């Protein structure tokens, strides 16, 4: 029971599936790195490091940022026009939904499935 009686919300998590994205942006490592960096700013998160991994010469990409408040990631499957996005932040000063929405605006999917959750700590 997330956020129930006696719970303190310590983090907010939004993640989703993006369908019908243009293949070119999903293959563009430099563009995806820039998008993740900007998403960290939009979320008001402190960027600590960023990395990426390409799965073969024509394969998809994983781009991830470690932020002081947790993480942001994009995983792509260009051959399917598909990406997954994950934004998790701790602290009231951050806005993971704003970061998620920013990434969606840049990847321009035809369809988005978004899921929200909180991470709660229960007092004993």
UniProtKB/Swiss-Prot annotation:
Under which EC number(s) is this enzyme classified? Answer: 4.1.1.50
| Catalytic residue list | 70, 75, 90
Q: How does the cofactor attach, per the note?
A: Binds 1 pyruvoyl group covalently per subunit.
- Cofactor(s) demanded: pyruvate
Which post-translational modifications are recorded for this protein? Is synthesized initially as an inactive proenzyme. Formation of the active enzyme involves a self-maturation process in which the active site pyruvoyl group is generated from an internal serine residue via an autocatalytic post-translational modification. Two non-identical subunits are generated from the proenzyme in this reaction, and the pyruvate is formed at the N-terminus of the alpha chain, which is derived from the carboxyl end of the proenzyme.
Could you tell me the keywords of this UniProt record?
Autocatalytic cleavage, Decarboxylase, Lyase, Polyamine biosynthesis, Pyruvate, S-adenosyl-L-methionine, Schiff base, Spermidine biosynthesis, Zymogen
The record's InterPro entries line, in alphabetical order, gives:
AdoMetDC_C, AdoMetDC_fam_prok, AdoMetDC_N, S-AdoMet_deCO2ase_core, S-AdoMet_deCOase_pro-enz
Q: Does the keyword S-adenosyl-L-methionine apply?
A: yes
A Pfam family this protein belongs to?
AdoMet_dc
> Which parts of the sequence are marked as the site Cleavage (non-hydrolytic)?
69-70
List GO terms (cellular component aspect).
cytosol
NCBIfam families for this protein: SAM_DCase_Bsu
**To which protein family does this belong?**
Belongs to the prokaryotic AdoMetDC family. Type 1 subfamily.
Designated name of the protein: S-adenosylmethionine decarboxylase proenzyme
